[in-house]
Amino acid sequence: MLLHESAASMEQSMPENLSTHMYGECEVNPTLAKCPDPVNVDHELPTKESCASTTIVSTSPTSATSTTKVKLSFSVDRLLGSEPEESHRQSSSSPSTKSCCDGSILACCSFPHCFSQANAESRRFGHATLPPTFTPTSSHTYPFVGLDKLFPGPYMDYKSVLRPTPIRAAEHAAPTYPTLATNALLRFHQHQKQQHQQHHHHQHHPKHLHQQHKPPPHNSTTASALLAPLHSLTSLQLTQQQQRFLGKTPQQLLDIAPTSPAAAAAATSQNGAHGHGGGNGQGNASAGSNGKRKRSWSRAVFSNLQRKGLEIQFQQQKYITKPDRRKLAARLNLTDAQVKVWFQNRRMKWRHTRENLKSGQEKQPSAVPESGGVFKTSTPSGDGTPQEALDYSSDSCSSVDLSEQADEDDNIEINVVE
């Protein structure tokens, strides 16, 4: 039995597509082939099964060999699930018929390890066998079974045994990080939805919630284990946002959300207004404290030197060009936008002064383009006119006053013109 099983395993290990013993229980006649050495003989290469069967027949008596082979065929057929017809045929066969009938490779051999064993083994391993009606023709007139084992055919693809292996390995391989993150995100949303539903149920039915919360501890632990990479991502994002928020200066934070009263008081003291612009400065600070501030930048406070330089340039040209404005901003250590806004406010005040002089005052409009000192000395009379001239001088008020006064002048000018 060990010889038969080893022969069957040897047959299964080799590709059985075009092997000559596959189409019938064929065995090489011992009178034709005596298991020659494959080194000396190249074209006559009998199989190992034929050699094994030949040694069995030669070393034992005829009657004992027949009985033992009958018993072995019954036991092996019962183990491997072969057809009963083959076993009856093997049991009824005599020792003289247990070899090839005419010596051809497609003869009617009855040894159990030729075709029935290979057929049962192939059925057990799930390989396709050739239907019995198909009988291929062979051009060889002598038993030639060696080279057929070396060429695979279309009847049994031995690569099918190896093909599922990399697919299974790819399926069971460690998933990539994007796959983990996506799956964790989906599970996180489902978990949050379940918690939301349980929270709603807890508000309406608080007594039944304790019964519902007893089974889910295992689910919560598994969800926390699955959501570990997602929690690490969210914590990383939170730390980055905190670092971004803490990296800003207090002034930037004040510009973003000046809601506290201390910040409003600081803004009021910074924008502290003198003279006529005081009320408007406080109003803007209170509006900023309420979150209704329209401008996202704080108003700059110019020094006396900067105001004098701006005023001198304004007296020379009311409408400054872009190159001159950039040069002036670089010389006074200001930005281009600050110089532009200051000139706009100053022109608005200048127009307002001109409109007031045209409306009934005795002041000549030609005296206005000169410097502020000349303007103050040239006023002959009038109590309100010197005070208004002091408001327009560069030394008596800050740029905040000029900007606030520009807002008032803008409204007044619109009312007058329209």
From Swiss-Prot:
Residues 295-354 bind DNA. Its main location: nucleus. PROSITE patterns: HOMEOBOX_1 (PS00027), HOMEOBOX_2 (PS50071). It is found in: Nucleus. One of its GO terms (cellular component) is nucleus. It comes from the Eukaryota. Residues 190-223, 259-296, 354-418 are annotated as: Disordered. Residues 190-216 have a biased composition (Basic residues). GO terms for molecular function: DNA-binding transcription factor activity, RNA polymerase II-specific; sequence-specific DNA binding. Residues 259-273, 391-403 have a biased composition (Low complexity). Keywords: Developmental protein, DNA-binding, Homeobox, Nucleus. Gene3D superfamilies: Homeodomain-like. Expressed in cells of the visceral musculature and its anlagen. InterPro entries: H2.0_Homeobox_TF, HD, HD_metazoa, Homeobox_CS, Homeodomain-like_sf. Belongs to the H2.0 homeobox family. May play a role in pattern formation during embryonic and imaginal development. Is not essential for visceral muscle morphogenesis. This is Homeobox protein H2.0. It comes from Drosophila melanogaster. The gene is H2.0.
